[in-house]
Amino acid sequence: MTESTTDPARQNLDPTSPAPATSFPQDRGCPYHPPAGYAPLREGRPLSRVTLFDGRPVWAVTGHALARRLLADPRLSTDRSHPDFPVPAERFAGAQRRRVALLGVDDPEHNTQRRMLIPTFSVKRIGALRPRIQETVDRLLDAMERQGPPAELVSAFALPVPSMVICALLGVPYADHAFFEERSQRLLRGPGADDVNRARDELEEYLGALIDRKRAEPGDGLLDELIHRDHPDGPVDREQLVAFAVILLIAGHETTANMISLGTFTLLSHPEQLAALRAGGTSTAVVVEELLRFLSIAEGLQRLATEDMEVDGATIRKGEGVVFSTSLINRDADVFPRAETLDWDRPARHHLAFGFGVHQCLGQNLARAELDIAMRTLFERLPGLRLAVPAHEIRHKPGDTIQGLLDLPVAW
């Protein structure tokens, strides 16, 4: 019997077929569930084709096992300077070609960069940092309690916790937090490429000037160590230092702040699971892992094939883009039964919220420590914490690549 050429699953794997109808990435209707428009991807194979904003078809990975395999495959490049590298949104069209430390380079350069930073983000170093994180969390909750309810949790707690911690770790003055937080927001969610590029320029100028001052007057942050410490591969030049500072500062506060606020909203919207946490039968560390899986706030890792690859019955050609839907990968029912359910009893630590392979998130130990301490202390100190407005009035950040809340009014 002849196989039908109109079979949609087969056609979706054929690069010569018409551009696929599913666009990627998409805004979420609900901040903690994948977009409804991803339904065709969820019902099909772990590898299919989608269309980017500019109409370009690329490969989309939605299965957990396949994602682990491909994220560890050196034939898929993260080099954003390549003209064919997939751009997830129009606002990134110009910025995508600029130098990006760690996330945007391949080995051996990536390995060289990562070796410089690994000691700072090791389990041991982050463990030693936990008392400082706890002190920061307690100080912010003290201020909230003095002011009394209601409070806006994003500005009062979720954003300051990681901002204060990453500033102390890097040696960036927290007094400048309004400047770099605003530029970070524009860089990630600006209305167009010009605004994204201006935000990046302003942030690089600020951090470059800070690095110049640190050369003359050393402090005790990571940037100071990178400037003045001897490195096996030689001194770190100014351009590289600025690139490090940009990625570490943004990644070090933006994603964790979104996880704290969105994680809190998710718990307050799931009373049964929150009751189990408050009863003390579940550790906060377990809750954090399940929230990381369930929320998958960073969507759409990108790669570029550097040679032809046979993958899951399809051929990914050299020069074709590959994107990874973290929100669907972490809802793979073959790995996470009842994946749509928030479940403290499931082993969730093998989620891919931090990526996988050599480019797995360098700061995941820090993020886990901040989330563990912030979430545990928040619900211990404010046992009556609740939403101050109906859930449908909570505004989430517009965006298709990183999820978060604009504000979170709470009372207790």
Curated annotation (Swiss-Prot):
Residues 1-25 have a biased composition (Polar residues). CDD domains: CYP105-like. Its EC number is 1.14.-.-. It is found in: Cytoplasm. One of its GO terms (molecular function) is iron ion binding. The keyword Magnesium does not apply. Heme binds at residue 361. Keywords: Cytoplasm, Heme, Iron, Metal-binding, Monooxygenase, Oxidoreductase. Pfam families: p450. This is Cytochrome P450-SOY.
